[in-house]
């Protein structure tokens, strides 16, 4: 998505600023309800040879180029009244290092729980902390909370059974600075994604920090979003309403594009997610956003090599999209039909002359062929979505997925309803249950599951399944890498459903992505 598509974020901020100026009472009220956040998608300067061992000075010179850009963005954000800014994972030092070659890029990291420290005001307290000092000073200059990611080192003793042979731990670390430059806390990434340069902490860091403008925030990084620890545990145990999320995410369509999973997490848990991704389109890395459960301000651009700053007002108390919604008397016919299918009762429609009833078993008059195709490296079972309306079912193991749909017009495209209930084993191992309505890459069944970004097909639909987990992420992507929001989500008769009418652009993906964290 080009930067022009993110203009509503800045426009929303401008309109709100005008509203704030109406009266002092209005201003106090609005400031209590909203805060101003920023995320920066950064096209980082990378080491030309990350496998080569360089000096600390050479490493600092490369990182300075990225930190200079960070400071420019902080000052630009300060002009817009930003109170918290988030920068991406790997944005300062880059990636593809070995354990040895990354060492000159690492800062020493004292524990904020043991040491209260302001690196900008106390620069000589610890050696090898130049990056932390620079970030601390940025927070002071911008007068805002600042979240960034860097590599850190921590010496360990041979008596420590987990101590690596080289006598140090190396961590992929997020740091949080307050607006006065104090190091508030640090989070060490737990779920590493093929990162040989870093160690996994012995214990999961469950990190929250308090702000005067929005209360409590939680912190995690990139691949963590797919796992119970720390992401879900933070929300369950600490009543967190806001997440800061540095990431270096390579887009994987049709189910795990960066903005797609960011938005899904915000919607599933009813929280705000401030997500900053790295910007390297040639590597498939783009997609940042400020996501609330109901609205998103995002950036996705595979063409423009430049970075992008997103600024938006964010509710301090986000409102979620859950529940079964309207009463039966207010429901449209498609939702009444959906409820009848779930209950197994006949569905009746009244015309001018008489009432017509169909048994639930007869609603799916066209039973299309079942086929298999690879999607996201998993062997999905699918059925094609043909015709202007219908009710489809497809099952795998214990999961059955259903689609009740109407189409105002037929496009010259193939869509399919797919199901997968099993262990995902490529680029990570984790158990998923997925119901997915996707546009296929072509007209052949073997193209279903391919990566596509453009679509024309419009649907009004209910998508649901008998999931064995409560942790279900609603993925919703439309043509041109745009995000949409379901009209309704929730449980009905032990089935989880997603409902949508009136798509404004062609459907790329609508999916319910369930995670069974306890199964491995």
From Swiss-Prot:
Keywords: Glycoprotein, Hydrolase, Secreted, Signal. PROSITE patterns: CN_HYDROLASE. Its EC number is 3.5.1.12. One of its GO terms (cellular component) is nucleolus. The keyword NAD does not apply. GO terms for biological process: biotin metabolic process. Its main location: secreted. The keyword Chloroplast does not apply. Residues 49-333 form the CN hydrolase domain. One of its GO terms (molecular function) is biotinidase activity. Glycans are attached at residues 96, 127, 180, 326, 379, 466. It comes from the Eukaryota. Pfam families: CN_hydrolase (PF00795), Vanin_C (PF19018). Residues 1-21 form the signal peptide. It is found in: Secreted, Extracellular space. The active site is at residues 89, 189, 222. It catalyses: biocytin + H2O = biotin + L-lysine; biotin amide + H2O = biotin + NH4(+). Belongs to the carbon-nitrogen hydrolase superfamily. BTD/VNN family. Catalytic release of biotin from biocytin, the product of biotin-dependent carboxylases degradation. This is Biotinidase. The gene is Btd.
């Amino acid at each position: 998505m080009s930067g022009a598509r993110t203009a509503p974020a800045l426009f929303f901020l401008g309109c709100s600023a005008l509203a704030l100026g109406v009266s002092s009472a209005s201003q106090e009220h609005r400031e209590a309800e909203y805060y101003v956040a920023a995320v920066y998608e950064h096209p980082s300067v990378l080491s030309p040879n990350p496998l080569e061992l360089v000096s600390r000075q050479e490493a600092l010179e490369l990182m300075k180029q990225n930190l200079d850009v960070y400071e420019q963005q902080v000052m630009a954000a300060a002009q817009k009244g930003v109170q918290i800014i988030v920068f991406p994972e790997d944005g300062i030092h880059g990636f593809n290092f070995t354990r040895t070659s990354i060492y000159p890029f690492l800062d020493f990291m004292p524990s904020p729980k043991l040491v209260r420290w302001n690196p900008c005001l106390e620069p000589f307290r610890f050696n090898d902390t130049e990056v932390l000092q620079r970030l601390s000073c940025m927070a002071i200059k911008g007068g805002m909370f600042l979240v960034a990611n860097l590599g850190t080192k921590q010496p360990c003793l041979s008596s420590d059974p987990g101590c690596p042979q080289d006598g140090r731990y190396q961590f992929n670390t997020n740091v949080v600075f307050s607006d006065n430059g104090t190091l508030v806390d640090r989070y060490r990434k737990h779920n590493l994604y093929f990162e040989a340069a870093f160690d996994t902490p012995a214990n999961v860091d469950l990190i929250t920090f308090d702000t005067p403008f929005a209360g409590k925030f939680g912190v995690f990084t990139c691949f963590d979003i797919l796992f119970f620890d720390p992401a879900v545990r933070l929300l369950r145990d600490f009543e967190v309403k806001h997440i800061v999320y540095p990431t270096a995410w390579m887009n994987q369509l049709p189910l795990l594009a960066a903005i797609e999973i960011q938005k899904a997490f915000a919607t599933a848990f009813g929280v705000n997610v401030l997500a900053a991704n790295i910007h390297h389109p040639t590597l498939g890395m783009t997609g940042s956003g400020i996501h609330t459960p109901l609205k998103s301000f995002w950036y996705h651009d595979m063409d423009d090599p430049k970075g992008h700053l997103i600024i938006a007002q964010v509710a301090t108390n986000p409102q979620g999209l859950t529940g079964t919604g309207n009463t039966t008397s207010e429901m449209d016919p498609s939702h009444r039909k959906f409820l009848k299918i779930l209950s197994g009762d006949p569905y009746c429609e009244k015309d001018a002359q008489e009432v017509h009833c169909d048994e639930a078993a007869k609603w799916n008059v066209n039973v299309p062929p079942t086929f298999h195709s690879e999607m996201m490296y998993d062997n999905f079972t699918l059925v094609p979505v043909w015709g202007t309306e219908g009710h489809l079912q497809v099952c795998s193991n214990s999961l059955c997925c259903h689609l009740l749909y109407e189409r105002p017009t037929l496009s010259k495209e193939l869509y399919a309803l797919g199901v997968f209930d099993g262990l995902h084993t490529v680029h990570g191992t984790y158990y998923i249950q997925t119901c997915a309505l996707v546009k296929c890459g072509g007209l052949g069944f073997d193209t279903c599951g391919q990566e596509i970004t453009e679509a024309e097909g419009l649907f009004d639909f209910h998508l649901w399944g008998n999931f064995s987990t409560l942790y279900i992420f609603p993925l919703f992507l439309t043509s041109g890498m745009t995000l949409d929001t379901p009209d309704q989500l929730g449980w009905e008769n032990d089935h989880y459903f997603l409902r949508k009418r009136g798509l404004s652009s062609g459907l790329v993906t609508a999916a319910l992505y369930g995670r069974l964290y306890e199964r491995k």
